[in-house]
């Protein structure tokens, strides 16, 4: 189930908190981490000084009001950038607070060295301690079940109310502190010290108190800093050039021009985009260990998918009853029903349901005096011995052949053909027997999840290769792979095959994603560029992965890849828009500033703004308000459609590149007209 944790972006608490943090973040010790906006803040301080002490900055008394306006607009620009980041952080803090409420101090039943039980606080537990949990107990700490089996309510962590079964010795042996034991009794070995639990790590991650920038974000910041330095040099050289041609440019105008030219839009939104990307993953109940993991998901070239539970439901369900040896379909259906009346497995229930849908009906007293024959690994058959002496069985082809041989019966000529046909279709054949006679075959089909073929088609359009991993024989694997639409499959796979496939793909320069839940998956999860572990799996798997799915839904790897691509697209789209904005603003305001002194420049003044002062103020106002206008896109992400990289590039250039060129001309002109009509400037 792909369920989102819904926390409103624009709730009163989050917005008020973001406004407060916007002022707190004005501290230069914090602002220097965002070099572009730090330059704007320094510029704000200089124009403030020019407003208070105009003579020291060569300003005339008439320019004090203008300097004050420039200072105010620059100040608001910095606040808007801080607000965008604080708003994104606010969502994470709200989610962290929700999780923190689930972390309660509980009492634990600690098993001491002599075997006695001592009641202690959960905060006193250490790694390696053994605790007992019974029905109704809150599990005091993360650990591994070493004895017993129990139903666990994990709704405090996952939000999912249905209990899950956890037991010792398997891939579903790990338990999380804060969850509740619904039934039975288990013995748990604590695997973490206080403050290092899975819930503690979740809180730190979603709160983002010490969010590390991803490599792509660092690289983009380096580019933005380089552009900022270039424009600082450009503006600094403009002053002596203007003086040479007898054009006077004030300090406030120089700073305003610099702020309009440097990439303030993406500089103000960059952190918000990264935080929001992590948040979008969290809303799908997936915890990413770093922003790097989310970004890596966006660059994935290959996805490894387990067949069972990911591509198929994993429950083989009855699809048909096929008669052999001249028997009728009705006869096979009836005895298939009889053989499964006491079979409580999903397969057995599906046989009963299908038989009844096809009109078969068992007598009300059929089970009276009947002996139930349970399925076992040795016999690989199950059924009933009826009170009238009739023996009814269903089982695997090989074991039924042995059984019929022992009973002195014969195998129908068409049985091999029907069994092979079912195997080629990717199904599992179960042969139905009455006494020493084969009646027919039950076709069990591992049903492919709805929509998987379409999703694989979308992944293929994005240039992502899909590889199905299965323990099935090659014929069955090939059939399911073709039906599902995966690009490649690995049949009869062993645990080491996964890591070998990952290394093979990585050797070809491809980034690989995979899901896993068992201890034997841990090496492959660690090797993969994106490893998504199931929360229901072992602690080893969760520690090896760089993402954990709280819903334990392996198909969610496809959503994670989509979110990663959306993050990269959003950053790229807004960067394109920002740089296109800067180019447009340059041609919009620079000619307006110097055309009065140099009439030859008027040919470049396509905007025909009312005055040089209005040109500067209009550009600054546009530069400030474009940040909050784009906050919803930064938070939500640009609309993502599966397509090739070239198609995405052309689409973004058209929408955000061309849009970034046009928007400043329209916006600045409108603001200029408003200023002129209101103030008569």
Swiss-Prot record:
It is an enzyme of class 7 (translocase). It comes from Caldanaerobacter subterraneus subsp. tengcongensis (strain DSM 15242 / JCM 11007 / NBRC 100824 / MB4) (Thermoanaerobacter tengcongensis). InterPro entries: ATPase_P-typ_cyto_dom_N, ATPase_P-typ_P_site, ATPase_P-typ_TM_dom_sf, ATPase_P-typ_transduc_dom_A_sf, HAD-like_sf, HAD_sf, P-type_ATPase_bsu_IA, P_typ_ATPase. Belongs to the cation transport ATPase (P-type) (TC 3.A.3) family. Type IA subfamily. Keywords: ATP-binding, Cell membrane, Ion transport, Magnesium, Membrane, Metal-binding, Nucleotide-binding, Phosphoprotein, Potassium, Potassium transport, Translocase, Transmembrane, Transmembrane helix, Transport. The active site is at 306 (4-aspartylphosphate intermediate). The keyword NADP does not apply. Gene3D superfamilies: Calcium-transporting ATPase, cytoplasmic domain N, Calcium-transporting ATPase, cytoplasmic transduction domain A, HAD superfamily/HAD-like. Pfam families: E1-E2_ATPase, Hydrolase. This is Potassium-transporting ATPase ATP-binding subunit. GO terms for cellular component: plasma membrane.
